[in-house]
Amino acid sequence: MRSTLLRTMAADRVRVLIADDQRLFAEALEAILSTDGRISVVGRAGNGEAAVDLARDRQPDVVLMDIAMPVMDGIEATQAIREHVPDARVIVLTGSDAPHDVSRARAAGASGYVTKDQIAGDLVRAILDAAGR
């Protein structure tokens, strides 16, 4: 009974994949998100290519995507995820608030754009909005 309840609770959580090449930032972000019972972090990727692979494998509801990453940047990774995992919503989470970066992210299929200085409440709200919850 308890395991069924725990599985049901986990199924109701928004499944989030973090894609950021700054390991300490990604770990801190995971720790912050893990304190919210509505969110379950399903993985972390250190580059865009790994993010695409993990998204295919883990089928997240939301991907938090940095733009400037090695191997494949966040814009390319967003396009690939939207193509291969169409139900996943991508929120670009980056240090840049330059209008051209916002435009590029939207054109790639991003559902949201949050700068890293807006982490706490804005990010949780953006995740829940993107997941339709």
Predicted feature residues:
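Acidic catalytic/metal-coordinating carboxylates
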Residues: 47-50, 72-76
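Receiver (REC) domain active-site loop signature in two-component systems and cognate sites
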Residues: 69
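Short, conserved "switch-loop" micro-motifs in signal-transduction and mechanochemical regulators
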Residues: 96-97
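Active-site beta3 strand of CheY-like receiver
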Residues: 58-64
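Short amphipathic alpha-helix used as the core "switch/output" element in two-component signaling
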Residues: 53, 75-87
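C-terminal output helix
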Residues: 100, 118-131
